[in-house]
């Protein structure tokens, strides 16, 4: 926690919302009963006086999107760190995820983490966004023939008078670095 809180960038006016997953940090929760997201936020607040790191919860968080002009009108964005491996096609895992949602719980938008993919798709009238990642390809990814999409996305959503999101725009920023080659023991790059 200390390493993260000391090194994670802090920018005036920006807040990072955290979803902890069912893998990596989630293993601590399963074995030791530690809620890593909560612990990270508390360490940031108590020890480092940081209020820019906010824990949304474990694996999923429904975020209410309020209409600016109609206070009683809203819809939901689901921030999800779903787990599971990358599929043969980028669209497959989000498709199966949306198909598994029960009636009445489909959000307007799902922002997916975990798969290290950047995408925008519409599946069953749900806008599905893969936010990319900040981790360059490593030996695990190369060995398993995975593709990591290093980068991120700025998304604008337009909400109509009944709360639906009929229009959106995503600006993707992709980075190409040589970390796989340069951060390994074999300097072939």
What do the PLM-derived regions correspond to, one by one?
Residues 59-71, 121-123:
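Short acidic-hydrophobic surface loop/beta-edge motif
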Residues 20, 67, 79-83:
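Short, structured patches in soluble enzyme cores that scaffold and shape functional sites
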């Amino acid at each position: 926690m200390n390493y993260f809180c000391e090194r994670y960038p802090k920018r005036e006016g920006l807040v990072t919302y955290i979803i902890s997953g069912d893998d990596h940090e989630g293993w601590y929760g399963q074995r030791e009963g530690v809620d890593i997201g909560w612990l990270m936020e508390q360490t940031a607040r108590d020890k480092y006086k940081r209020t820019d790191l906010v824990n949304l919860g474990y694996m999923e968080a429904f975020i209410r999107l309020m209409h600016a002009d109609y206070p009683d009108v809203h819809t939901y964005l689901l921030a999800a760190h779903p787990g599971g491996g990358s599929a043969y096609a980028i669209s497959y895992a989000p498709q199966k995820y949306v198909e598994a949602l029960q009636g009445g719980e489909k959000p307007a938008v799902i922002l997916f983490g975990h798969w290290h993919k950047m995408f925008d798709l519409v599946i069953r009238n749900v806008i599905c966004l893969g936010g990319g990642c900040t981790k360059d390809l490593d030996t695990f990814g190369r060995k398993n023939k995975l593709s990591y999409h290093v980068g991120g996305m700025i998304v604008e959503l337009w909400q109509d008078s009944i709360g639906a999101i009929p229009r959106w725009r995503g600006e993707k920023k992709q980075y190409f670095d040589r970390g796989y080659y340069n951060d390994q023991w074999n300097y072939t790059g």
